[in-house]
């Protein structure tokens, strides 16, 4: 695994529009962190509800998908197309890179949520509910980051549908309708987030192997890269 990860990090430097993609990744991560901190200040006033509880986390999780995008774009190169690296890039290396990036993102979100919950004990339950949503989103994004390069339109429709479903679940959770079993203990909430990360990583690897022979979707890449497909 370590060998694959080192090669993946070397390869992403040669991805399509690498500098611009890294810049966008940093912007998403920074915006997500700022939104998380702003959300905390709103929660202190007792005004935050709905998607405001997790929008910062969504931005942070989105930033974790960009390295995988760069990695898979390297498989468009002619030399890679004719080498044994192509399958590894689109399957095991992509799944491992996504797992690492998602782990980093989830750990940062958990850190922010736990720090806030420890400082403001009365809001700990609110933060743990948000971690439950984070776990659902990390599972969804993990699978999306594999399927999108093969079935672009279908994957967009799927992520929109399930994002709306998570929003409905959050409204049910925050509206006081959910049974107590859904309001997890802090350790269980953290464990759930990491558990969904692991489940998503395993499923994404299996899916990547299942759809490997499917041609990459032109719509999933910019115009310059699409011409190489």
Predicted regions mapped to residue ranges:
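Short helix-to-coil transition segments within interhelical loops
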Residues: 81-87
């Amino acid at each position: 695994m370590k060998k694959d990860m080192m090669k993946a990090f070397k390869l992403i430097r040669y991805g399509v529009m690498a500098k611009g993609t890294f810049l966008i990744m940093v912007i998403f991560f920074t915006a997500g962190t700022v939104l998380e901190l702003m959300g905390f200040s709103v929660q202190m006033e007792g005004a935050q509800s709905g998607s405001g509880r997790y929008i910062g986390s969504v931005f942070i999780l989105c930033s974790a998908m960009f390295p995988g995008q760069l990695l898979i774009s390297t498989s468009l190169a002619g030399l890679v197309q004719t080498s044994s690296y192509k399958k590894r890039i689109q399957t095991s290396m992509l799944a491992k890179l996504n797992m690492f990036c998602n782990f980093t993102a989830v750990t940062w979100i958990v850190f922010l949520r736990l720090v806030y919950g420890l400082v403001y004990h009365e809001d700990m339950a609110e933060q743990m509910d948000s971690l439950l949503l984070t776990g659902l989103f990390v599972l969804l994004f993990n699978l999306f980051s594999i399927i999108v390069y093969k079935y672009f339109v279908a994957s967009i429709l799927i992520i929109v549908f399930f994002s709306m479903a998570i929003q409905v679940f959050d409204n049910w959770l925050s509206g006081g309708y959910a049974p107590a079993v859904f309001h997890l203990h802090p350790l269980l909430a953290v464990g759930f987030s990491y558990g969904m990360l692991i489940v998503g990583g395993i499923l994404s690897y299996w899916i990547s192997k299942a759809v490997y022979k499917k041609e990459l979707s032109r719509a999933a890449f910019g115009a310059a890269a699409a011409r190489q497909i």
